[in-house]
Regions:
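Conserved GNAT acetyl-CoA-binding A-motif
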Residues: 97, 104-116
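Conserved beta-strand in the GNAT
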Residues: 55, 61-70, 77-82
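A short, internal acetyl-CoA/4′-phosphopantetheine-binding micro-motif in the GNAT/acyltransferase core
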Residues: 81-88, 114-116
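A short beta-loop-alpha structural element at the N-terminal edge
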Residues: 4-18
């Protein structure tokens, strides 16, 4: 299994919509809403311009995406990490977090949020990626945990 990352371009918008919709469909069904699900082409094109996105390729097949934004010097936020369901549980997410840490060499702090109810995400970020929960937030009717990794 060969994993590669390619920076997304505007022409990747529809492909990314398909990846996001596949990856976030269960969240949409579970919570009734999900910011990553159901994006329009215009929304995804704007998102690609605003936040660098990297397409996760497994044996050259697009299977996920990771995106990050700079909050301040040496502080970043992972704004999206998604893998299509049939490729989840194969280590791609862990490798994507490592990719982000290597890409932003100056990082001292990386944050992200995920729904508290998604125990598998909480376990993934804390046990496999070295994050810890620092606070809770609410987005509509969804309680979110804010995670941080520091070095």
């Amino acid at each position: 299994m060969t994993i590669e990352y390619r920076k997304a371009e505007a022409e990747d918008a529809q492909m990314l919509i398909n990846i996001y919709n596949a990856a976030f469909y269960s969240d949409y069904k579970r919570f009734g809403a999900c910011p990553g699900y159901g994006k329009t082409l215009g929304m995804m094109e704007a998102s690609i311009r605003e936040h660098p996105k990297y397409i996760i390729l497994c044996d050259r097949k697009p299977v996920g995406c990771v995106s990050c934004k700079m909050l301040e010097t040496s502080a970043y936020e992972i704004t999206c990490l998604c893998i299509v369901p049939e490729y989840q549980g194969k280590g791609l997410g862990t490798q994507a977090v490592r990719f982000v840490k290597a890409l932003y060499e100056d990082w001292l702090k990386i944050t992200l949020v995920t729904p508290v109810e998604k125990k598998e995400n909480v376990k993934f970020y804390t046990e496999k990626c070295g994050f810890r929960i620092v606070s809770a937030e609410t987005d509509g009717n969804v309680e979110l945990a804010r995670f941080v990794a520091e070095r």
